[in-house]
A protein has these predicted regions:
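Bacterial N-terminal signal peptides that target proteins for export
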Residues: 1-9
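Bacterial N-terminal signal peptides
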Residues: 10-20
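Non-catalytic pre-domain segments flanking phosphatase-related domains
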Residues: 18-79, 87, 101, 105-107
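C-terminal cap/substrate-recognition subdomain and adjoining C-terminal extension
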Residues: 28-40, 57, 65-66, 157-366
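Electropositive phosphate-/nucleotide-binding environments in soluble metabolic enzymes
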Residues: 46, 150, 264
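A metal-dependent, Asp-based hydrolase signature
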Residues: 88-91, 95-177, 182
Length: 366
């Protein structure tokens, strides 16, 4: 009898294999509790993080009166200075234009005078601390439209990525393309894990943004930015409504600026492209206030807005006094404030060191 029992047990194990104690013996796996992931290993305990976690816990709880349906969990992130560095010592796209016009042998001798003046203004600001001209955001946008005109989208994407592979000015151990704020990448991951959809809404060129955020998994259709008009290869000056693009044609950039995606333009673009009011918004400057206010005016759902302040002079090229003043301004506006100095355990990750600029630039702060 004992031998018969052992033979039957052996047969069960042989037949069921590794599933013997699950499928064959019907063990209830629902009693096994999943391990909770700590999404914020690069953060210190702080008010802003607690506010974010409390908010997410509330609006994702089906029993809460503040519950938000998953399809309406829309989050908008500014890019420069919000989750990628902008203080080395200026925006990536400004650095790129300076390089394109003043250093790129394939283009610099053919640059129009107004484009050259814009690039030189950036260089004078970076190297000598000279003030940029008033309304330089628009001056730059118009110059950039001209500087990259004629490039196919694939060519421009490759151009941006090639420059992004260069050593980031003012740092050791990091390229421009690696200069993400590591704690903010954890925010992206945390929100996605809780059913939110993250969008990048930047003042920088849409196709620059797409090239930079590709490495962190942001899909191109979730990127909104400055736009120039596109044309197909053989379209010429013919209006798109009158021209049929051929199968062998590519899309190319033109020198016509459509929109600089700052301030209220961000709200207009969000409305046109996403079609929903965000419930969370992240930014770092006055160019993001309209987007934040739009979020906080959400007529249907509880919402929240967060502003980063660049107050860490030890690990980044920051102006603490200016940052603290802005922090007070943002709090008064009803935004949660994230201190890069106090709230981030790291900014760019291990092995990255702030330095004097490798080419002798003084790293002047705005």
């Amino acid at each position: 009898m004992k031998k018969h029992y052992l033979w039957m047990l052996a047969a069960i194990l042989t037949f069921c294999g590794p599933m013997a104690f699950t499928s064959c013996l019907h063990v209830d796996n629902s009693i096994v509790k999943p391990v909770k992931k700590d999404y914020f290993t690069r953060w210190n305990s702080c008010e802003a993080l607690s506010a974010l976690q409390d908010y997410v816990k509330d609006v994702t709880n089906p029993a809460s009166t503040n519950f938000i349906k998953q399809e309406d969990r829309i989050v908008t992130f500014d890019m420069d200075g919000t989750f990628i560095g902008e203080l080395y010592p200026t925006y990536f796209e400004y650095n790129l234009l300076e390089y394109r016009v003043l250093e790129d042998a394939a283009y610099k001798n053919s640059a129009p005078e107004d484009v050259r003046e814009a690039a030189q203004a950036i260089r004078d600001f970076v190297r000598e601390g000279k003030k940029l001209p008033d309304h330089f955001d628009m001056i730059h946008a118009q110059a950039a439209a001209k500087a990259y005109a004629g490039m196919t989208l694939a060519e421009f994407d490759a151009y941006v990525k090639a420059y992004a592979s260069k050593q980031a000015n003012g740092f050791r151990g990091m390229t421009y393309g690696q200069s993400f704020y590591k704690p903010m990448l954890q925010v992206f991951e945390y929100l996605e894990a809780n059913g939110f959809t993250n969008y990048v809404v930047s003042g920088s060129d849409r196709f620059i943004c797409r090239a930079l955020v590709e490495s962190i998994g942001i899909e191109p259709n979730r990127v909104i930015g400055m736009d120039v008009r596109l044309r197909s290869t053989n379209q010429g000056l013919e209006a798109g409504v009158n021209y049929t693009m051929g199968k062998e044609e590519n899309l190319i950039r033109t020198d016509e600026l459509i929109i600089k995606n700052l301030k209220t333009n961000k709200v207009l673009q969000i409305t046109q492209e996403i079609g929903k009011v965000p419930v969370l918004s992240f930014g770092n400057s006055s160019g993001d206030c309209a987007m934040h206010n739009f979020c906080l005016s959400n007529p249907t759902y509880k919402s929240a807005a967060f502003m980063l302040i660049a107050d860490d002079e030890a690990r980044d090229h920051a102006n603490r006094e200016k940052a603290l003043s802005l922090g007070n301004q943002w709090r008064e506006a009803g935004y949660h404030v994230i201190s890069m100095r106090d709230d981030f355990k790291t900014i760019y990750g291990n092995g990255v060191e702030k330095t004097e600029d490798s080419d002798g630039r003084p790293g002047v702060q705005r």
